[in-house]
Amino acid sequence: MNSSPAAKPVDGALFDMDGLLLDTEIIYTRVSQEIVSRFGKTFDWSVKANMIGRPAIDSSRYLVETLNIPMSPEEYLAEREELLKRYLPQCQALPGAEQLIRHLRRHRVPIAIATSSSQELFAIKTRRHRPWIDLFDVVVTGDDPEIKSGKPAPDIFLVAASRLEVAPERALVFEDAPSGLQAGLDA
């Protein structure tokens, strides 16, 4: 007979941000499609699925090579950054995200954001959501000097757990991307 393993108590929660707390994926898709369409290419799920949750330079390299577009990953990133700064301030919270964070805060559960986004893009994305984003005890961004490797490496979740003063094995990770899920499991 298969029985579910007993639930283990947790001492803290670690959250990815893009596509989990904030609905930014639609904006990233729009921006990428806007760039690659100039070269007659399509940014579809087969490409996007391999980019979600990875550091920006790795994702950009994958896109440029896979779609064979005539620009360097750095050029793509620079153009993408400008477009993101225009569109990201309008991103919406995903349904239930704010309520969950407020619930955890009321129950004194330590919470952290562990996002691959840079500090600059984090600030742009969260500007409209500060009343509940500020409830997080810790925010770790992808450009944090302690992060040696991006997702799927566990670094970002290990740093977030450490700053929360929670043992990684006693933290619950909330993730939506395959690379992030692997990072959470490895942490």
Where are these regions (language model features)?
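Glycine-rich phosphate-binding loop signature in dinucleotide/nucleotide-binding domains
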Residues: A6-K8, R106-V109, L164-R170
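Hydrophobic packing residues within well-ordered alpha-helices of enzyme cores
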Residues: S32, S60-L63, A97, F122-T126, ...
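Substrate-recognition "cap/lid" segment bordering the active-site pocket of phosphatases
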Residues: Q90, S118-L172, P178-D186
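Active-site neighborhood of HAD-like aspartate-dependent phosphohydrolases
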Residues: N2-A49
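Short, acidic loop-to-helix structural element flanking the phosphoryl-transfer center
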Residues: P9, R86-I113, Q119-A123
